[in-house]
Structure formats: C-alpha cells, structure tokens
Amino acid sequence: DNDQWKRYEIFQDTLGGRPYLFNGGLPPGGSDGSGAPGIDYQVPAEALTNSEFAAIYKEAQKYVGTPYVWGGSTPETGFDCSGYVCWVYNQNGYNVGRTTANGLWNKSQHISEAEAKPGDLVFFEGTYDTPGKSHVGIYLGNGMMVSAGDPIKYANIHSSYWEKHLAGFGRLSK
C-alpha cells in the first residue's frame, strides 16, 4: 500500500538509520565529554511517519560519524553541537541562523520531557565551563538524541553523564 511505500522510501533515504554501514563512514563512537561510545540506534518507523520529523532526521543522520569541530557549522567545516542543530533545522525551512546552544534555548518554546517528541531539542548545562546551556541535541524519542559529540552520534539522554547535565527540552517553530 501507499503507506508502506512511503516508509520504504524513508528507509532508503535514511539508509535504515545506519549510514555508516553503506558509505564506509565511521560507526557512532569515539568520545565526547561523556566519555561514552556512540550507541547503534534505529529511530522507530512510527516516528518517521511524521513528515516534518522524517525530513529533520533525514538531514541529521547524514552526518553521524562526522568529527566534532569547535565552531563548525557546515558539512565542509564539520560541526559543533549548535552548528549541527542549526544546520539541520535551517536546511528544513526553520530560520534559526547560526547561534549557540543557549541561543537555541532562547529561540525555542520550553516544554517538559513528557511533552517532548521526535524533532524537538534537548539541552544540557555544565558540559563545559560556560554559563547557560552548553550542549544541544536533536531529540529522537524514547530517551535518545543525536548530537555533535566527537563524532556526531546517538546517545541516551538518561545515561549517567547526560542525565546529570540535562537542563530541558525546547520546540522550534518555523
């Protein structure tokens, strides 16, 4: 049926959420401030039925395995956490420009974890010495995010490291 073809098309476009298996890229891993390797994660198919999130995820997953670059904001330069999120959302018709994690927090509607859905943002404080929000990721649902650690990778926001820095969730508007 048409719905099944749409899901198959999304699967093809996103390479099943595992692009490193298909393009010779690195698997999620390495270390960021958490010291933890990346997690092999596949976004549930039902989350991808939301076309807005599917488009955000399609763009975001292209860069899983890309090394972290402080101040980076394009695929050519590499990404830091806010550069990655800004790139993904700007490519999907959001007008967020290039800002910091704290800047994204200020641009977003603050929501609870219970209200958070795939495609919202998840924010952290104290991941390095800066006032306000110091890290941002794209929430994937089920306690998972994708963010620019080193490299860009999937992570569980309730792991011991991320849990102690969890500061809140935000939703951007077009």
Tell where the protein language model's regions lie, with residue ranges.
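Acidic/histidine-rich, surface-exposed loop or edge segments in extracytoplasmic proteins
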Residues: 37-40, 63-70
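Aromatic- and glycine-rich peptidoglycan recognition patches
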Residues: 110-113, 128-174
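Hydrophobic packing segments in regular secondary structure
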Residues: 1-54
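Extracytoplasmic/secreted envelope proteins and their assembly/folding machinery
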Residues: 8, 53, 57, 61, ...
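Solvent-exposed, acidic/flexible segments
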Residues: 46-53, 77-82, 115, 130
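Catalytic cysteine-centered active-site loop
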Residues: 66-118
